[in-house]
Amino acid sequence: MTTIDLNCNLGESFGAYKMGNDDEILPFVSSINVACGFHAGDPSVMRQTVEKAMQHNVAIGAHPGFPDLIGFGRRNMNVSANEVYDYVLYQIDALDAFVKAAGGKMQHVKPHGALYNMAATNPEIADAIAKAIYHMNSSLSLYGLANSEAFIQAAEKYNITLVQEAFADRTYKEDGTLTSRTEENALIKNEDEAIKQVLQMVKEGYVNSVNGEKVAVQAQTICLHGDGEKAVQFARKIYRTFEHNKISICAPK
């Protein structure tokens, strides 16, 4: 039976501001990435998200981003590799404290937004992220864009496990990178089209780029976004589609 991980970014509320549909999404995913206070989230939200994740028995990972609350971590920042290392180490250690306090074990790290996209094409940024993971806990996996040489080389250098990731509701360019969110066609808004793309990636190992070219994708995890208007409906639909196609949903071992 084919097995795939379904992951979602959660814990992105901040103070009085609620983001996402965390409680409703949790039953349909196998791993989550928890915001660590830089681009979103706060200590109370981090603790609550960890506790809920443990109740649902899903794998818990840190979701470090740039210190950019206003831009939600989706804006590129002109930072050094050392700064990236500091940002990531600080955030993943903070989340790990909450996970340990709840009696759990953190499983992975997935960079957020602009940090993720920059790392996918910038070896120095990817290296800084992998080094922070290695120094904090080398048993943690790194979730990174499938086929990204920067992520692959960084993970190999520090001997950490890379879990290659694809996206259910994002479009791809012919080089295998994601279409920028600044472009109108960055998101797949039609649920059926998104599910078709996911099944292509999981069962056939490719995705159609925005230009119609076939791009090879060997993904071990699929990201669902939990903050969309129909996020819960889509999560439920893809979960049932996988069941129908005998695709097992399970966090990476």
Swiss-Prot record:
One Pfam entry for this protein is: LamB_YcsF
Enzyme Commission number(s) from the entry: 3.5.2.9
Q: Which GO terms describe its molecular function?
A: 5-oxoprolinase (ATP-hydrolyzing) activity; ATP binding
Keywords, A to Z, come to:
ATP-binding, Hydrolase, Nucleotide-binding
A Gene Ontology biological process in which this protein takes part is:
carbohydrate metabolic process
Its UniProt entry gives the catalysed reaction(s) as:
5-oxo-L-proline + ATP + 2 H2O = L-glutamate + ADP + phosphate + H(+)
The record lists the membrane-crossing segments as none
In terms of superkingdom, the source organism counts as Bacteria
Which InterPro entries does the UniProt entry name for this protein? Glyco_hydro/deAcase_b/a-brl (IPR011330), LamB/YcsF/PxpA-like (IPR005501)
What family does this chain come from, according to its entry?
Belongs to the LamB/PxpA family.
Quaternary context: Forms a complex composed of PxpA, PxpB and PxpC.
Its function?
Catalyzes the cleavage of 5-oxoproline to form L-glutamate coupled to the hydrolysis of ATP to ADP and inorganic phosphate.
PANTHER family, per the entry = 5-OXOPROLINASE SUBUNIT A (PTHR30292:SF0), UNCHARACTERIZED PROTEIN YBGL-RELATED (PTHR30292)
Protein name as it appears in the record: 5-oxoprolinase subunit A
Taxonomy of origin reads: Bacteria, Bacillati, Bacillota, Bacilli, Bacillales
